[in-house]
A protein has these predicted regions:
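Rossmann-like dinucleotide/flavin-binding elements
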Residues: 130-157, 197-208, 225-227, 244-272
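Conserved beta-strand segments of alpha/beta enzyme cores
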Residues: 153, 192-194, 238
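N-terminal Rossmann-like dinucleotide/flavin-binding domain of flavoprotein oxidoreductases
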Residues: 68-78, 86-88, 166-215
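Glycine-rich FAD pyrophosphate-binding loop
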Residues: 152-168
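Redox-cofactor binding/interface segments in oxidoreductases and associated redox assembly factors
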Residues: 219-220, 241, 263
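Residue-level detector of alpha-helix initiation sites
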Residues: 25, 76, 137-138, 162, ...
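Ferredoxin-type iron-sulfur electron-transfer modules and their immediate structural context
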Residues: 1-130, 217-237
Length: 272
């Protein structure tokens, strides 16, 4: 008997499949490797490895609070992510092979969290360490969240007047309202994260100064910038960068367009 067949046989003998609800928790502790290795395709496709089959099964059983708890174990800011997630899990969903349509996984996540108040951030005992995070965009916010959760004292330095980075400066308000970002920042401030706005770290001297004042410095600088197509004519008058155009729209200072407009591309930026 091959190793794979032996593991399958052990599973058949040790797991009561009539009682299994496939919620994925067993895979974290089970001694049988094939349960851990053969993860649900949706979970394997998720960048954070969320226990997707777990919270979907709990929702199906009317256990919404338990489903939220399962997601919250691995996903901070679920109220925010559920509005903008690219949901690669749905592309990997087994239902696509059966009837051509995935389970609406992100829709379920949004059902669970949209409109729900964010829970306070629970922090570990104070470590005595201090950390400066430069940048309050998506990377900086997540870094500050995880560091504060671990018990470190965190200060965030942001060049703009508010936190959020591209989430606030480019995404349309119908997709991600400012109030959601404000709630994220508010929860972090309640947990003790200190935000310093209008603080642009522009040279080595400023960085060295922070390094002297804090035990560690996290660089979460903006990576924003429009991509060029490298085709002839893209620098001509009337050809606009989607990145710059969306920023102007978000700021309320967009130039007025008239006549026919061609949008090159078919992704989320093009749709926005």
């Amino acid at each position: 008997m091959s190793a794979g067949n032996l593991l399958e046989a052990l599973t058949d003998n040790l797991v009561d499949k009539t009682k299994c609800i496939f919620w994925g928790k067993c895979a974290e502790t089970c001694i049988l490797d094939n349960i851990r290795i053969n993860r649900a395709p949706c979970s394997a496709a998720c960048p954070l490895g969320l226990n997707i089959q777990g919270y979907v099964q709990l929702v199906a059983r009317g256990k919404d609070d338990e489903a939220r708890a399962v997601i919250a174990q691995d996903l901070p800011f679920a109220q925010l992510i559920c509005r903008i997630c690219d949901h690669p899990c749905e592309h990997a969903c087994n239902r696509c092979k059966i009837d051509g349509q995935a389970v609406n996984i992100n829709g379920i996540k949004r059902y669970l969290f949209a409109g729900e108040k964010m829970l306070p951030l629970e922090c570990a005992e104070a470590s005595g360490k201090t950390v400066a995070v430069i940048g309050a965009g998506p990377a900086g916010l997540l870094a500050a969240h995880d560091l504060r959760k671990a018990g470190h004292a965190v200060s965030v330095y942001e060049a703009e007047g508010k936190a959020g980075g591209l989430l606030r400066n480019i995404l349309p308000v119908w997709k991600l309202p400012d109030a959601v970002l404000d709630e994220v920042v508010g929860i972090m401030e309640q947990a003790g994260v200190v935000f310093h706005y209008g603080q642009r770290i522009v040279d080595q001297k400023a960085l060295d100064d922070l390094s002297q004042r804090y035990d560690a410095v996290v660089l979460a600088l903006g990576a924003g910038g429009g991509r060029k197509a490298s085709i002839e004519g893209e620098e001509l008058p009337g050809v606009l960068s989607a990145f710059r155009f969306l920023m102007e729209v978000r700021a309320g200072g967009c130039q007025k367009l008239s006549g026919h407009v061609v949008v090159v591309g078919g992704g989320y930026v093009a749709l926005d």
